[in-house]
Amino acid sequence: MIYDFEGHTPKIDPGSWVASNAVIIGKVELKKNSNIWFNTTLRGDLEPIIIGENSNVQDGSVIHTDPGLSLIHISEPTRPY
């Protein structure tokens, strides 16, 4: 489910994937090729949350911000060579 909150609509890149029962609220941005898995909640009701390119948030995760603490930014994972 995707929810607007106080005039803020989540920004979801068309190349990202969101599980059918994930919840995304407010000031959340999903970059290209990001994945949000089952039973996950991203609550951007207070401050922004950015999930970077090629990143994923695994099953059952809850990410929420506190007032006045800028943002949460999950960036591309390190890849082994």
What are these regions (language model features)?
Residues 9, 48, 70-71:
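Short, structured helix-loop boundary elements
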Residues 1, 68-69:
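Acidic/polar low-complexity surface segments
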Residues 11-13, 18, 30-31, 36, ...:
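All-beta strand scaffolds that present successive hydrophobic residues in beta-strands
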Residues 26, 44, 59, 65-67:
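Residues on the solvent-exposed faces and adjacent turns
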Residues 72-81:
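Single conserved hydrophobic/aromatic residue that forms the stacking wall/gate
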Residues 1-33, 41, 45:
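Extended, small-residue-rich solenoid/repeat segments and analogous flexible loops
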